[in-house]
A protein has these predicted regions:
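Residue-level signature of catalytic and energy-coupling elements of molecular machines
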Residues: 5, 17, 32, 48, ...
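Conserved interdomain hinge at the start of the Helicase C-terminal
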Residues: 203-234
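The conserved Walker
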Residues: 34-38
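Pre-Walker A (Motif I) flank of P-loop NTPase domains
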Residues: 26-32, 58-62, 110-111, 229-231
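Post-DEXD/H (motif II) to motif III coupling segment of the RecA-like Helicase ATP-binding lobe
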Residues: 130-139, 143-200
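Walker A/P-loop NTP-binding motif
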Residues: 18-30, 41-57, 70-82, 121, ...
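Conserved pre-motif I regulatory segment
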Residues: 1-33, 50, 140
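Conserved nucleic-acid-binding Ia/Ib motif block in the N-terminal RecA-like helicase ATPase lobe
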Residues: 2-3, 7-10, 57-125, 133-136, ...
Length: 234
């Protein structure tokens, strides 16, 4: 595993990797707010690979849920790069392609499955999709899955996998439905918040004018009269 990391040119962990990998290696649940491009994929892949290197092959032990086919394929590529010198096997399960090769991977008990929710549920209707030995569940970009309407699918998937497992939950934002889902899924999680703080767009200047309620209209008209604004949206 270290050889693969070295060949990829990794010399020091990113902040999310430094914060997430230790509790993940300890087997703790994890709730992490981190943006795309922060290195979060390696933050959950490396602990999974470390856990699975010496386990018996033939049983799917890790499931990674992704909102899109493109992200699933990127995660698959990252796992293959990191696991190149290990016996760990991985397959991606997503829509828009035939189910045959995916069925073969599930029948063989590939170690790690990276999947989009809809296609995974299609397979879960069949007896060959067995997840009784699952040890680790990862939700990547959970807020995007919410935006795409996958929350009911995620809840259905949870009914097909063991309740006793490690869950690693990654989301760039934490809207109320996602926060509620974390309370259902996670047990005493390690909490990491590296989400980018909101900032005004480039070229936008923000200002605050403390003013009494009865003077708001007069202040607004005075600001417009100054002529500093070419366009205004109220």
């Amino acid at each position: 595993l270290l050889k693969g990391v070295k060949e990829l040119g990794f010399t020091r962990p990113t902040p999310i990797q430094a914060d997430a990998i230790p509790p993940a290696l300890e087997g703790r649940d994890l709730l992490a707010c981190a943006m795309t491009g922060s290195g979060k994929t390696a933050a959950f892949v490396l602990p999974i690979l470390q856990r699975l290197i010496d386990t018996k092959r033939g049983t799917t032990r890790a499931l990674i849920l992704s909102p899109t086919r493109e992200l699933a394929l990127q995660i698959l590529e990252d796992i293959n790069d990191l696991a190149v010198h290990t016996p760990v096997t991985v397959a991606a399960v997503y829509g828009g392609v035939g189910m045959g090769p995916q069925e073969h991977a599930l029948r063989s008990g590939v170690d790690i499955v990276v999947a989009t929710p809809g296609r995974l549920l299609d397979h879960m209707k069949q007896p060959y999709a067995k997840f009784s030995g699952l040890e680790v569940l990862v939700l990547d970009e959970a807020d995007r899955m919410l935006d795409m309407g996958f929350l009911p699918d995620i809840k259905r998937i949870l009914r097909h996998i063991p309740a006793k497992r490690q869950t690693l939950f990654f989301s760039a934002t934490m809207p109320a439905p996602i926060a509620a889902l974390t309370r259902e899924m996670l047990h005493d999680p390690a909490m990491i918040n590296l989400a980018r703080k909101s900032a005004p767009a480039v070229g936008i200047t923000q200002a605050v004018y403390p003013v009494r309620q009865e003077l708001k209209a007069a202040l607004f008209l005075a600001l417009l009269a100054k002529g500093d604004m070419r366009e205004a949206l109220v």
